[in-house]
Design a protein with these regions (language model features):
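Low-complexity, acidic/polar, glycine-enriched regions of mature
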Residues: 21-201
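Bacterial N-terminal signal peptides that target proteins for export
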Residues: 1-8
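Residues at the start of alpha-helices and the adjacent loop-to-helix junctions
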Residues: 8-9, 13, 59
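Hydrophobic h-region of N-terminal signal peptides that target proteins for export
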Residues: 12-21
């Protein structure tokens, strides 16, 4: 037996010990991709409230809006909302509607979309109520804001009952600082959300 053959034999004899020392293979990881959930715009409502300096509450709504909820790989959710200002209205008040769409308020001609993108959050917050942090883009200006979600009134919020959330912003921070003598600086957005389809198990 020459030196090369002896070396090969020794290597083969030591192979079982090397294999035994190897850590066991990790089990395959099952990656689940869940489709986004979408707002049912026919059954959802998205509006806003602002008060006059005399205490009168002015209520408006966004007839056109859209929203989706992304399900992240770690189970958290992330919501994306769009509100279209060119159709915003104060029901029954043509003059107020024109003013809300005009340059002193939403400035719909230059800024036709208001957007809110949340940070990832635990979906249990929708059941229990709580704050959802995010960022609002309004009139080309972006600031961190908070949506406050009411505690759910049913076992399947978004399907059997509305998910109700509110977010109050200071309009002066977004360049909507005219009419301060007549209107409060606070504008509250109100979302009553229903989802399309059926809940996944």
């Amino acid at each position: 037996m020459n030196a090369w053959q002896r070396g090969l034999l020794l290597a083969l004899m030591g192979l079982p010990a090397v294999l035994a020392a190897q850590p066991p293979a990790l089990p395959a990881v099952k990656v689940t991709h869940r489709a986004p959930m979408y707002l049912d715009t026919a059954r959802s409502q998205l509006g806003f409230e602002v008060r006059s300096r005399l205490g009168q509450r002015i209520e408006g709504n966004f007839p056109q809006f859209e929203g989706r909820i992304e399900v992240l790989s770690d189970g958290r959710h992330q919501v994306h909302l769009k509100m279209f200002t060119r159709t915003v209205e104060i029901p029954g008040k043509v003059r107020y509607t024109g003013w809300m769409r005009g340059p002193d308020f939403f400035d719909a001609e230059r800024h036709p979309v208001v957007e809110f993108d949340s940070l990832p959050y635990d979906p249990a917050r929708v059941d229990q109520g709580g704050d959802i942090q995010g960022r609002l883009m309004l009139r080309g200006v972006s600031h961190p804001e908070v949506l406050r979600v009411d505690k759910a009134e049913c076992a399947r919020p978004g399907y059997d009952c509305d998910v109700v959330s509110r977010g109050t912003v200071l309009r002066g921070r977004y360049g909507m600082d005219n009419w301060q003598f007549a209107l409060s600086d606070r504008v509250t957005f109100v979302l009553r959300a229903r989802l399309t389809g059926v809940p996944e198990p």
